[in-house]
Amino acid sequence: ISACLVGSEMCIRDRDMNRKFKKLGLTCNVGTECEFYLFEKDDRGRPTCIPIDFGGYFDVAPLDAGENLRRDICLTMEQMGMAPQHSHHESGNGQNEIDCRYAGPLKTADNVMTFKQIVRAIAMRNGLHASFLPKPLPQQAGSGLHINLSLYMDGKNLFEGDIAPDSVAGSFMAGVLAHSRELTVFTNPLPNSYQRFGCDEAPRYVSWSRQNRSQL
């Protein structure tokens, strides 16, 4: 099993991706901002649609009922070699967000899967249900998994300053936009995913912007 872990010289996934980036002379870092809801359970232990609180964006206790649970999640993440950076109540009732420090693409992908298992397990231990569904409550904000990408060449962040269309960073963004339909197979695999689009800070247009959160 250890041979399959990112960082091992025998990890085929890691070795193949590193070879491709080295050929291009690039280093890629990926950071995540993962949102989820915490719901109460009924007397039989089944999930309900009742959020654990009625707090809003960046609320604190007592309006934020998930503060201690998020702390347990972050401590567990650190014990498992992950690096949580920020934790706060999101805009939806019972909605939470935990951000993780950037790492390589494969390491980050593995961390996201581990993170979700940690959240579900700790929520269950506290008699709650954690949901990563994009739009669990029609009248509340949807949950996203924001992916922050950076490209480096010779130690320089290629996304700093003005980005020319014919630059490496410009070509990278053009590639993401050109393949946006294909990417939705992985980023939005459920019918429920599309109920989130077009609302609040969810994507609305296939374009890019430095500030507008409704851009893809």
Predicted regions, residues:
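Conserved structured core elements
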Residues: 30, 67, 71, 92, ...
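Noncatalytic alpha-helical scaffold of FAD-dependent oxidoreductases
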Residues: 15-19, 63-73, 80, 125-127
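Residues forming anionic-ligand binding surfaces in small-molecule and nucleic-acid pockets
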Residues: 6-8, 29-62, 78-103
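Loop-rich catalytic cores of soluble enzymes, especially ATP-dependent carboxylate-amine ligases
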Residues: 99-105, 120, 124-216
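Single conserved hydrophobic/aromatic residue that forms the stacking wall/gate
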Residues: 1-7, 12
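Structured beta-strand-rich cores of soluble
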Residues: 13-22, 27
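Acidic, His- and aromatic-enriched active-site or binding-groove loops in soluble protein domains
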Residues: 51-77, 105-116, 153-158
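Secondary-structure boundary elements
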Residues: 23-29, 75-83, 107-108, 115-131, ...
